[in-house]
């Protein structure tokens, strides 16, 4: 499970396998935590959020079944976004209050590649909000599909 961390927080990774621990370490490095000392293997790994694939996200949006939260930074979103998505950079979720974006629908978080979406979904789940991340792919994969993608200033 991912959580929002401060730069000086100590991190302890619990994992079922070495591969799972390595995957967690890669995710932490992807968001700027470069000094990792190790991990602890456990028999039962923590509860996880089930990821959403791009194709599933398309269907959920067609059915108006979810709210998409774009957790990228403003300059990234300015390059383009999914119409109807809510913008909330992942690093601001705690400060702004996770409940400020809850509207009764399940939430799907998305970023450029998946790392920040995983963190954001975990913050939301910890706040009692039904949230799932797009972990495999992200905005680039959405942009590559034939589904609607809006560039800022294009209406």
Whereabouts are the PLM-identified features?
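Rhodanese-like catalytic fold shared by cysteine-dependent sulfurtransferases
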Residues: 1-67, 71-155
């Amino acid at each position: 499970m991912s959580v929002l961390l401060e730069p000086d927080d100590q991190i302890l990774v619990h994992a079922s396998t070495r591969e799972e621990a390595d995957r967690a370490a890669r995710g932490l490095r992807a968001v700027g935590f470069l000094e990792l000392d190790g991990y602890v293997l456990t028999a039962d790994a923590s509860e996880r959020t089930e990821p959403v694939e791009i194709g599933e996200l398309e269907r959920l949006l067609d059915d108006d079944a979810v709210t998409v939260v774009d957790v990228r930074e403003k300059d990234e979103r300015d390059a383009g976004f999914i119409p109807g998505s809510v913008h909330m950079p992942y690093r601001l979720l705690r400060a702004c209050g996770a409940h400020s974006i809850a509207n009764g629908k399940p939430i799907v978080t998305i970023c450029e590649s998946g790392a920040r979406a995983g963190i954001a979904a975990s913050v939301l789940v910890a706040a009692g909000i039904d949230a799932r991340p797009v972990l495999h792919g992200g905005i680039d994969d959405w942009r590559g599909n034939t589904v609607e993608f809006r560039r800022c200033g294009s209406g």
